[in-house]
Amino acid sequence: PGGVCLLLLLLCQFMEDRSAQAGNCWLRQAKNGRCQVLYKTELSKEECCSTGRLSTSWTEEDVNDNTLFKWMIFNGGAPNCIPCKETCENVDCGPGKKCRMNKKNKPRCVCAPDCSNITWKGPVCGLDGKTYRNECALLKARCKEQPELEVQYQGKCKKTCRDVFCPGSSTCVVDQTNNAYCVTCNRICPEPTSSEQYLCGNDGVTYPSACHLRKATCLLGRSIGLAYEGKCIKAKSCEDIQCTGGKKCLWDFKVGRGRCSLCGELCPESKSEEPVCASDNATYASECAMKEAACSSGVLLEVKHSGSCNSISEDTEDEEEDEDQDYSFPISSILEW
């Protein structure tokens, strides 16, 4: 009798261990309540939930691979999904996030950056070229979807470097879309290893590499832009210039040079687009429509100012004043940062 009891005890222990191991660990529970994204099979709930992830879930069924495949592909996930975390207790969401119970009484990690040490309460311009109402709003955007987002300067994003105060040793530069950015100029450019690295700038100067063009742009404080790849040549027309990457040569009659530009862009049918006055003194429905006309004619067109050619804003006059003082070439040139 003693031997039988011992055998039964061992059998029960074996079944208990097997049931503890049988189960599947999943990385999330979907809105339909099913487990999705299989992490590992044959794990106990304790082992699965020890990862500490808020979204980790577990299913008890020890099923074969065919059933798992059907669940994931045809059924929207595994049924009888058990979330590892039912409350916010002992949930570590990481820096800048906090665990809160949502409307369905489920724990969720939400963005909650520490904004207590922020001294500047006004709007800021982010590295993405967008204006945020304050630095705390920018930190929330960084937490949600843009981990590399930072403040580049205080105040709203501007179209000119006037009144832009860049932090540290960075310098204000106007890019090809006429937006002001703070960049660092003191980079060391390596010597080119191949003649294929040469670039012709929109200023007619040959640069040894893209790094040299970026540095020259930075020191100048506004966009120089890339005309075409290779050394600058004395072209008489666009027929002398070979464009790469699906670009088309547009001729700039003002300076007698060609420039390779991207064409074929479809203009969106949006009523929010602002009309622009182009360098041919014609008004276009949008900047995209102007580029479309330029690609069609083969003649380079630049934005003189926003709005129709019959109206000139004060900001435009300021920008034109800056252009005469600093640089005689167009500021809306293409700059490949």
From Swiss-Prot:
UniProt keyword annotations, A-Z: Disulfide bond, Glycoprotein, Repeat, Secreted, Signal
Stored CDD domains: KAZAL_FS (cd00104)
Biased composition regions of type Acidic residues, renumbered to the chain: 314-326
Compartments reported by the entry: Secreted
Signal peptide start and end residues: 1-22
Cystine connections: 25-48, 35-81, 49-84, 88-99, 93-109, 111-143, 115-136, 125-157, 161-172, 166-182, 185-218, 189-211, 200-232, 238-249, 243-260, 263-295, 267-288, 277-309
Gene Ontology annotations of biological process type: cell differentiation
Follistatin-like domain location: 87-110, 160-183, 237-261
Transmembrane parts of this sequence: none
Matches recorded under Gene3D superfamilies: 3.30.60.30, TGF-beta binding (TB) domain
Glycan-modified residues: 117, 281
Taxonomic superkingdom: Eukaryota
Domain TB: 23-96
Assigned GO CC terms: extracellular region
SUPFAM superfamilies: Kazal-type serine protease inhibitors, TB module/8-cys domain
InterPro entries (alphabetical): Fol_N, Follistatin/Osteonectin_EGF, Kazal_dom, Kazal_dom_sf, Prot_Inhib_GrowthFact_Antg, TB_dom, TB_dom_sf
Region described as Disordered: 309-337
Self-association state and partner proteins as the record states: Monomer.
Name of the molecule in the record: Follistatin
Annotated organism of origin: Ovis aries (Sheep)
Gene transcribed to yield this protein: FST
